[in-house]
Amino acid sequence: MSTGHVSTIDTPISPFTAIVAMDGAVLASGWTASADDLLPQVSPSLRPTTLAHRRDLGEVTRAVRAYHAGDLDAIADVRVRQRGGEFMGRAWDALRTVPAGKPISYADYALLAGRPTAVRAAASACARNAATLFVPCHRVIRTGGATGNFRWGADVKRWLLAHEA
């Protein structure tokens, strides 16, 4: 039996909720007011069996507030924990190296993740990313410059990209 902590923070976009492990690592996050939207995204082997609601998640809450207030690097050192195959892990790690204000294409993302021909797998890594914001999948766009898909909606992705520009 494991317990995760959850908190919702008001942001200029919409409420932002994060689920963190007992050690403070982010398991899932996104622009929603409901932990129920996030829990299914957590790998079953990491998924908490109970959630304890908190007003403040310490480092995570500070980073979310600072990021939305303009400190775009505030999210860089927040610990995350996700499970996926070897490529997924490399791809999520690679995403954390993409600087704010410098979006990349899915093809460039596949190259950065070490598999230049695996564009679909790179897109899948974005889609399966549970730790949105901290693993900034919003920084991956289509080759022609279109924003592409985003779990939390095109308006949220456009806001994030404009905020980081």
State the predicted function of each range:
Residues 1-116, 165:
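Basic nucleic-acid-binding alpha-helical/helix-turn surface characteristic of O6-alkylguanine DNA
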Residues 119-132:
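Regulatory, non-catalytic segments
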Residues 18, 140-142:
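Active-site and channel-lining beta-strand-loop segments
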Residues 133-140:
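Short Lys/Arg-enriched helix C-cap and helix-to-coil transition segments
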